[in-house]
Regions:
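Jelly-roll (double-stranded beta-helix
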Residues: 1-59, 64-85, 93-171
């Protein structure tokens, strides 16, 4: 990868804010790197939980966010405020919730060909896992909408087998 000169991230955000749109609102900052480095803006409308085979680094630049996680079978909210950073351990299911006007930086390690990311959904009434899909992520910007579309178009996958609650697509 050729050397890329330093750039002002705040200026980049100001000039590219329109790219940080729902449902995920992320924009890859560097191509051909060993890391996936993304600017991510709110609001987002995610109900999925991501399972990353390696750690994820979060740095909240503007506004606050809540990282919903599943830890030891319990749903746990991790608030990350402007100026704060957080290192999420590998394989912890997580769902970033970003309000309007928020912007963060997320860094992940590129996956090897043998590694798969997971995306799961949990019943909003009882917490039971509704569905899990594992995929080899090549292009997160194009693959996430496809994964979400498959889940939300399936009534069977959105219906809880424990309590019968049906998850609706995010607004």
């Amino acid at each position: 990868m050729p050397a890329i000169p330093p750039f002002n991230l705040q200026r980049w955000i100001a000039q590219n804010r329109s790219l940080l749109k729902p449902p995920v609102g992320n924009k890859l900052l560097f191509e051909d790197s060993g890391f996936i480095i993304m600017a991510v803006g709110g609001p987002n409308s995610r109900k999925d939980y991501h399972h990353d085979p390696s750690e994820e680094f979060f740095f909240q630049i503007e506004g606050n966010m809540v990282l919903k996680t599943v830890q030891d079978g319990r749903l746990v909210d991790v608030p990350i405020n402007a100026g704060e950073m957080y290192l999420l351990p590998a394989q912890v299911p997580h769902s970033p919730q970003r309000p309007a006007g928020s912007v963060g930086l997320v860094v992940e390690r590129r996956r090897g060909p043998e590694e798969f990311d997971g995306f799961s959904w949990y019943c909003e009434n009882c917490g039971h896992q509704l569905h899990m899909e594992r995929v080899a992520v090549g292009n997160i910007e194009t693959q996430l909408p496809e994964i979400f579309s498959r889940f939300y178009s399936s009534l069977a996958q959105r219906t809880c087998s424990v309590c019968g609650t049906v998850m609706q697509a995010p607004a």
